[in-house]
Amino acid sequence: IEMAAELRTFLDGPRAPRWYEAGAVAGVLDAQSGAAFQKQSLFRGAHTPLAPPMAMDVVDDMDGRRIEATVTLGLAYEGPPHGVHGGYVAGMFDDVLGATQRMMEKPGVTGRLTVHYRHITPIEEELTLRAWVTGDEGRRIVAKATCHAGDLLTAEAEALFIRVDFTEVQSRMAARRDPSPNPSGA
C-alpha cells in the first residue's frame, strides 16, 4: 500500500494551489484569488473537466449591477427526460449567486440556498441565468437569480450569504486535518 501511495504522488503531479491561497489579504479576497476561483469553479472552471462552457458577465443597467451567464447543457447533465438534473440547476444557481455577491465588499459563504423549480430546464438549449443582490446588511448578503430558456422561466433562487474572514476559515479547516494536539485545549 505504501508503494501504491508513493506511485500515486508521481501520477498526481505537484499539488495545485487552492483558489484562496492566491491572494486573500486580511481575510478579504482580491482579484487574483477571484480569478483563481473562477478557474477552479465546479460549474464553469477552465480547470474542471466536467464544467460546461458557461460564459459569465457583469452587467450594469438602470436596475443596477448584476451577473448574467449563458450556458447550453448536453446529455451529461440530463435528469428528467430532455431536462437538466435539478441538483445541477441548484449548483449553477449557487455558482452564479456566489459570483454576484463577490461583487460586494467582503463576500461570504452560502448560508442558505432556496430553489423554486417552475418548469423542467431543457438540455441542449441555451440557458440564461441572471443574478443580483437584493440586500446587504452587516454580515448578511441576500441575492436572487432566475434561469430562462428563451422566454420560459424554468427556475428561480434566493441565497443568503454570510460574510466570513477567509483566512480564519482556512486556518480552522486546516487545523481539523492537523493530527497534533491542540495546546489551548479548545
Named regions from a protein language model:
Residues 67-69, 113, 129, 143, ...:
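Hydrophobic residues positioned within well-ordered beta-strands of beta-sheet architectures
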Residues 58-60, 119, 133-135:
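Short, low-complexity Ser/Thr-rich regulatory SLiMs
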Residues 35-41:
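Short Pro/Gly-enriched beta-strand edge/turn motifs at strand-loop
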